[in-house]
């Protein structure tokens, strides 16, 4: 029983180490400045700390958007929620073939600082849920929890 509690405690601790909600007052000025420079009219609904980086969640033109920003204020990637039908056809084909019975719950277009685009499809079946990552052409890259 003690081992189970230890495993659960470690799992929860590690999970929160990847992305932790923080108050705006905990966000360094350089990070906030970098965000405001790129999105001067946006209002951040939530800040998270992801390792050494920060994530700002906000709505842009009524669309859920988030950006990952480094400690110096440079935007590393932008994630924009898209309609499932906006995923490349190859993504839908891959999911139908390899994950029959699963439903795409959410879709995201991710653009890194170099302009490289990837897509993330959050799929679920019952209580099972995970993300599938694809390149800009819809070719499968990896499965993420």
Regions found by a protein language model. Give the residues of each.
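Bacterial Sec-dependent N-terminal signal peptides
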Residues: 1-22
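Mature soluble domains of exported/periplasmic/lumenal proteins and thiol-rich metal-chelating peptides
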Residues: 20-145
């Amino acid at each position: 029983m003690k081992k189970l509690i230890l495993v659960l405690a470690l799992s929860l601790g590690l999970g929160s180490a990847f992305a932790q909600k923080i108050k705006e007052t905990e966000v360094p000025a350089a990070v906030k400045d970098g965000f405001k420079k790129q999105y001067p009219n946006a209002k951040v609904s939530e800040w998270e700390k992801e390792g050494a980086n920060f994530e700002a969640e906000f709505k842009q033109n009524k669309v859920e958007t988030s950006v990952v920003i480094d400690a110096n204020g440079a935007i590393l990637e932008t994630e924009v929620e898209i309609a499932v039908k906006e995923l490349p056809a190859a993504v839908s084909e891959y999911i139908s073939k390899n994950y029959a019975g699963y439903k795409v719950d959410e879709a995201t277009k991710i653009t890194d600082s170099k302009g490289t685009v990837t897509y993330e499809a959050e799929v679920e079946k019952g209580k099972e849920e995970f993300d599938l990552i694809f390149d800009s052409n819809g070719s499968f890259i990896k499965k993420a929890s």
